[in-house]
C-alpha cells in the first residue's frame, strides 16, 4: 500500500497453539512480515504438554488479519483462531 491512503482497520486477537516445534521458524517469519500491525505478543511455553501458546494483538485491515490467521492455521501442527473487535477505525496505510 502507498503511504497517505486511508484504510479501515480493526483490532483483533489471534490465539495460536503450536504443537509442532518445527513450525516455529515459519510462524515467526509470518509474524515478522506483519510486524507493522502487531500491537503486542505474549508467548507461554507449556512444557508439561510440549506445546506453545501464543496471543497476538493486531490492528490491521480485516483482510490482512484473515490472511495472516489463515496462513498460520495452515502450518502443520499449528492451530489459530481470531476474535475481532466490532470497532472499525480509519488509519493511514503502512508501507508493506
Where are these regions (language model features)?
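Long, contiguous binding/interaction regions
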Residues: 1-96
Amino acid at each position: 500500500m502507498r503511504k497517505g491512503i486511508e484504510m479501515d482497520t480493526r483490532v483483533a486477537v489471534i490465539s495460536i497453539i503450536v504443537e509442532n516445534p518445527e513450525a516455529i521458524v515459519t510462524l515467526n517469519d509470518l509474524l515478522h512480515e506483519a510486524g507493522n500491525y502487531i500491537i503486542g505478543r505474549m508467548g507461554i511455553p507449556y512444557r508439561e504438554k510440549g506445546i506453545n501458546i501464543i496471543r497476538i494483538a493486531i490492528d490491521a485491515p480485516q483482510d490482512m488479519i484473515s490472511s495472516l490467521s489463515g496462513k498460520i492455521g495452515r502450518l502443520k501442527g499449528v492451530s489459530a483462531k481470531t476474535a475481532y473487535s466490532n470497532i472499525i477505525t480509519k488509519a493511514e496505510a503502512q508501507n508493506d
